[in-house]
Amino acid sequence: MIKAVIGLGNPGKQYEDTRHNVGFMIADVVASLLKCNKKYIERCFSHIYVCEDHYLLIVKPQTFMNNSGVAVKNLLEDYDLKPDEILVVYDDLDLPLGTVRLRKKGSSGGHRGIQSIIESIKTDEFPRIKVGIGRPERKEQVVDYVLSPFKKEEKILLDKVISHTAQCILNVLKYGIDKSLNLCNKKIV
């Protein structure tokens, strides 16, 4: 049973609407749908929404993406959670915008935030949702791309992706991962 949904991103206004913050965007939508209360937990280095009616935490680590493992490890320790009780939501360069993938476990795939979590909690056996953001055009550096906002023409699709992913998370919470795979793993158009 999932007890914490963790959306990855970077803290600060300058990163708010960037590709790397799609996990934060989705966490906020799920927290709103579930009518959760927000608070900052210093030891966990995170903004945490407490969803009392659902026995759920929605977490936005404030350690910056590449150090997400610090916050996740503290969260697991402080709330006595197991890795299979968290669901991590994050951006994925290797999937085109509009693609969403729910996985039970797996490698980092080169994502530094996920790599930080794997190294910190000493396992890759935790569920995750990868949200495609696509790759940059040839000339643009990856770091510049992930820290850039979505283009105007991408925002309509992005809104659909965020809505779909939020519904996917609600489905996982209600029915579990196995029963949610077909619903979640989609290409949104």
Curated annotation (Swiss-Prot):
Which chain positions carry the site (Stabilizes the basic form of H active site to accept a proton)? Answer: 91
Mainly resides where? Answer: cytoplasm
Tell me the enzyme class: hydrolase
The UniProt entry's GO CC annotations, sorted and at most eight, read:
cytoplasm
Documented EC number(s): 3.1.1.29
Q: Which CDD domains match?
A: PTH (cd00462)
* Protein family membership: Belongs to the PTH family.
Name under which the protein is recorded: Peptidyl-tRNA hydrolase
